[in-house]
């Protein structure tokens, strides 16, 4: 059964917002209301459709039970009922999912970090492939990707790249990408045609705001230095590069991508803030995980989550045992949504089961 009283409150809230929109409101209030309406619209539509279907089912049941109904009409009603039952179940499930507790971070922008792991140059190339996959996926969502820092590999790709992904719901869609991604393929430099295995680590952090993390100046060790290029040579004469250490956690962020020390410091603080915030969230989630099973995988960055097997053209997500034989489309970013959708559905099913709603 669905919580009818709660659904009535949602419908009333939706109607009140629509009515208020017709009055004179400030620009800020207008933006706030349209955002809330956009969040309510899907569940309100589902509730209205569900109630219409239940009323239709009740009408059919009454027709079937009525002795005055002739045989032909009764047969037609009985034939229509299974489709309506299926639609009813579908709408009820949609409503249950919409009523699940939301992650407060889901609407946040994302700090995306991709690092080459084991595998040398091939790992750097794979890290580059992964970053371009996410870049394309973000573009398809209408999001903006801004590279904050990048360390290129000697043969291409990246040893490490950090970017900000800006867009509504970015964290909700990308949060299950954190973990170790493994690739199996024949490198261009492999003369014998042997398949090599390499890896890259992906971290997806919700962008933290200043109010989320209290960073005391006394807890920071800030060092400046001259930026270095490939081979270690200094590339400018001013100390624009910066390294910030958060002493309590030991988290270190280095930044030298801009010639401006001020910009490098601002970027480093932004990354540091998100890493500190994420570390605390990880600690809390780890403490809770013993009591709940509503996560897709452990969320541990050291967990191997996915394998990209180029010779077989397949991608396997190990958390949900899903294999897609469309590796080119996934690595291009065009079919990544199929994996993300499946992970989201699995996560929601686990949440429903934990709440006794499945």
From Swiss-Prot:
Methylated by PrmC. Methylation increases the termination efficiency of RF1. One of its GO terms (cellular component) is cytoplasm. Belongs to the prokaryotic/mitochondrial release factor family. The keyword Lipid biosynthesis does not apply. InterPro entries: PCRF, Pep_chain_release_fac_I, Pep_chain_release_fac_I_sf, Prokaryotic/Mito_RF, RF-1. The gene is prfA. The modification N5-methylglutamine is found at residue 233. GO terms for molecular function: translation release factor activity, codon specific. It is found in: Cytoplasm. This is Peptide chain release factor 1. Peptide chain release factor 1 directs the termination of translation in response to the peptide chain termination codons UAG and UAA. It comes from the Bacteria. It holds the Pfam family PCRF. Keywords: Cytoplasm, Methylation, Protein biosynthesis.
